[in-house]
Every structure is written in C-alpha cells, then in structure tokens.
C-alpha cells in the first residue's frame, strides 16, 4: 500500500514512468535516467522526502542508474 501511494504521488508530480521499491522501511525511487535531475530539484526533493516519510518510510534514495526494465532479473 505504501509503495502504491508513493508511486501515485510521483505520477501526480509529472513522472509517468516510476517504480518505488521497498527495502524494509527504506524506499528506492526509480525514474527514467533523463528525469533524475528533475526529481532532485530542491523543492520537489524536499516534498518527496516529506511525503515518503509520512507514508512510513524511514529513508528515501534515488537509483542513479534510472528505471531499467528487468533490473531485478540480472545475474
């Protein structure tokens, strides 16, 4: 539920391709590589962190590789 809410927040803020991975209470955000800079704009980044913490995550990170299909299937 927390992941779905986090992804919905990102979509509401203009990110059409998103993935939030939950590692316990830590959230890892994946957006396309070309959108990472947008995600890290200071105002948006602060709002993202505040929102994700309010959803129950204790930390938030951004995957600097970007959103890559099949990433978890790598050997």
Describe the residue ranges of each PLM region.
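ATP/NTP-dependent adenylation/nucleotidyl-transfer catalytic domains that generate, transfer
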Residues: 1-75
